[in-house]
Amino acid sequence: MFGNNRPMFGGSNLSFGSNTSSFGGQQSQQPNSLFGNSNNNNNSTSNNAQSGFGGFTSAAGSNSNSLFGNNNTQNNGAFGQSMGATQNSPFGSLNSSNASNGNTFGGSSSMGSFGGNTNNAFNNNSNSTNSPFGFNKPNTGGTLFGSQNNNSAGTSSLFGGQSTSTTGTFGNTGSSFGTGLNGNGSNIFGAGNNSQSNTTGSLFGNQQSSAFGTNNQQGSLFGQQSQNTNNAFGNQNQLGGSSFGSKPVGSGSLFGQSNNTLGNTTNNRNGLFGQMNSSNQGSSNSGLFGQNSMNSSTQGVFGQNNNQMQINGNNNNSLFGKANTFSNSASGGLFGQNNQQQGSGLFGQNSQTSGSSGLFGQNNQKQPNTFTQSNTGIGLFGQNNNQQQQSTGLFGAKPAGTTGSLFGGNSSTQPNSLFGTTNVPTSNTQSQQGNSLFGATKLTNMPFGGNPTANQSGSGNSLFGTKPASTTGSLFGNNTASTTVPSTNGLFGNNANNSTSTTNTGLFGAKPDSQSKPALGGGLFGNSNSNSSTIGQNKPVFGGTTQNTGLFGATGTNSSAVGSTGKLFGQNNNTLNVGTQNVPPVNNTTQNALLGTTAVPSLQQAPVTNEQLFSKISIPNSITNPVKATTSKVNADMKRNSSLTSAYRLAPKPLFAPSSNGDAKFQKWGKTLERSDRGSSTSNSITDPESSYLNSNDLLFDPDRRYLKHLVIKNNKNLNVINHNDDEASKVKLVTFTTESASKDDQASSSIAASKLTEKAHSPQTDLKDDHDESTPDPQSKSPNGSTSIPMIENEKISSKVPGLLSNDVTFFKNNYYISPSIETLGNKSLIELRKINNLVIGHRNYGKVEFLEPVDLLNTPLDTLCGDLVTFGPKSCSIYENCSIKPEKGEGINVRCRVTLYSCFPIDKETRKPIKNITHPLLKRSIAKLKENPVYKFESYDPVTGTYSYTIDHPVLT
């Protein structure tokens, strides 16, 4: 592994640099090392075995390989160094003597510490020994990185610089910094020496160059070739290719530097970035960036070439490559201006002549400057330059050349600047023109649309659509068509030309008028810029009838064919654009603004408003004379006839009208107590009498009215059923109140009247009246003292019909409700007495009754609403304050403890749907049990024969 004849990485004698190497390196004649150093000599007569890293040596008669590829004729060291018959050091340093031991780092007894042989402290080797990394040579020794020297007595520097004399640290020949006094020594940064040497590459592929890559006819770090190959930036070199595409013919380094073939005596060195410097004579030493000097001169850091004779005869160059002679020496500047070479620029531009390309593809032939001159080639964005030596400024200003500017300007004679300002001569000659970034064409336009000249020119397109010699519009509708002058518009519609026929319409309808009118066209806001059309006037969006209308109806001028359009607010402007005019315009064309503003020839022309938009607004003549309100006289007859009632109906209803019910038998305070008649009657009053009594609003105006006694007397003709022929019978009084002072005659008459009433009670008419008039006793006469006569028998008869009614002071209503005490009794009580009414009973003859067991307060309760309104009965049910929103609290009003008795509360048989009256029926017992379990009511009694159910409740009003 560390000294066998077979390589480690499996290469069959060709590991890394041959046609069958592991990493695909290919060569035609000679194998390559890892770093592309080709070690081929005229004296190699044996098969060269290759190491693992591609380095080989051509020691005669021996093909043994080490780990790092050193081919030695003798035993191999640990790192592949070749040793004759000597012992190896730990790092394989080989000594040239047969009995000497290797030192620590592989240096021989007369060598340096890093593997260089005897000559120099920095590894200059004069014997045929190998460096630690396996670079081998028959007569010369390699340095630390394997650079070798072709001289039999030559030495190698640390980075592979080779010269005929002693090499410095960085490969310079002569002193450490390469400055020769009378000779042609190289400086520290790669100025080459004039001595001829073989074409072996250093670490970066430089052949006999300094540390920074000055090379003679071989590839640099980025593959710059001296003849025709291409480097990383497209320069074509004739030799092999690097990893960036440059392919040398011979062996290449890691980055594609080509090491020249045998027999080449011209040292052509390349720079760091692949600049190639070729020369026909002598050794051309290159600088850091590949500048070439013709003679044996010293170059600066950036490869500047100085051909004049300086002190001690040296040709010294300046810092940026400016040559100090007037000879034909070709040297490249800082940005890659190169002479006498053929290559492509960074982006692939190709040059016609033998000039190299700069950073942006500028191709310079002979005398390039830093920023200006350039040769024919392709620019950054693809512009073609086909003329001879032309120099272009930073923004594309180029005098009389075909080179385009940075932003795409291309012209044969007159280039364009950044904003399109053209550097034109004073004469009005025709020329081809290029376009700037914003489309301003040269020869005519200023940066903002000014028109300097009226020369004829070609056409070009801009970014915003400005195109001369065409009929297309730009983004904002500016048309730049012209037959004589390019009609280019500014960014905001400024027309910076002298064209006579521009017919396109802008985005908002701004249209430059011309001699030829379009048929139709209206702006977005109704801007119509044509004064005449073939179809008719164009209406704006707001209904304006004028031709050229702005946003608010302002119209442009219609005076000439100069094409004036309306602005946003109707201002008319007949002046030119904001650009400075150097030449008077041919035709006075007005300019178009962004929103269609129009120029007006004079300020005396009054603005025209839109009739449709402001037709409804009355504009006063002045502020001091406002429009006054119109007044009209009112006729006296109209004033007299007008009244407050004219706003109402001709026959309005009265607010409070009495009830028109004639069927009511008993009325109190204009209020009928009959619920059926009250429900069916029609009242003209706005307010309901019932609601008025519920709210007690009537008592507000007449508080003593309630205590007045009202007597309603009606003549009942049906009572005269008994015809008496004598005068005595005619004098009989129906109802009298007997007193102790009454005479016997009065007692006799009273007994007769009682007997007659008994007969009348059994008559059919009396029975008929029982159904209708039992609740309204009809007094027919008065006593001498004026008291009312009440038939007591009637009360007894009615009381006998109502079960459980003990008192005779009862008032019955036609809806079968009754109340006790009667309404008359309750009405005669004072306010204090109404606050405590005992034994109040409200009932229905068919459904049941309610007996209040505690005194009730009827002061705030309307009496006629107790029966049927506040207390309602139904089959097997009784409810109090059911339909009222305002309910009394517990213990107030009638919300006190009471006993409720319901009639006919029989359970219903589900099969027959009939009440169960059998006292032994099981459902009856079950129904009684449910009644007892009711938690709200307290069960008292149930009569199964009559079906009377009685219970008590503490607070009957359910809140």
Swiss-Prot record:
Every Peptidase S59 domain range: 814-956
Repeat region (GLFG), residues: 77-80, 112-115, 168-171, 271-274, 287-290, 300-303, 333-336, 345-348, 358-361, 379-382, 393-396, 490-493, 506-509, 523-526, 550-553
InterPro entries linked: Nucleoporin_FG_rpt, Nucleoporin_S59-like, Nup98_auto-Pept-S59_dom, Nup98_auto-Pept-S59_dom_sf
Keywords tagged on the record: Membrane, mRNA transport, Nuclear pore complex, Nucleus, Phosphoprotein, Protein transport, Repeat, Translocation, Transport
Region (Disordered): 1-104, 121-172, 190-394, 672-697, 745-794
PTM sites of type Phosphoserine: 763, 783
Membrane topology per record: Peripheral membrane protein
Compartmental location: Nucleus, Nuclear pore complex; Nucleus membrane
GO terms assigned for molecular function: molecular condensate scaffold activity; nuclear localization sequence binding; RNA binding; structural constituent of nuclear pore
Comp. bias regions, Low complexity: 37-48, 56-81, 92-104, 121-136, 154-172, 259-293, 304-317, 336-352
One Pfam entry name: Nucleoporin2
Membership in a protein family: Belongs to the nucleoporin GLFG family.
PANTHER family: NUCLEOPORIN (PTHR23198), NUCLEOPORIN NUP100_NSP100-RELATED (PTHR23198:SF30)
Note: Present with 358 molecules/cell in log phase SD medium.
Name of the protein this chain belongs to: Nucleoporin NUP100/NSP100
Species per Swiss-Prot/TrEMBL record: Saccharomyces cerevisiae (strain ATCC 204508 / S288c) (Baker's yeast)
Gene (UniProt): NUP100
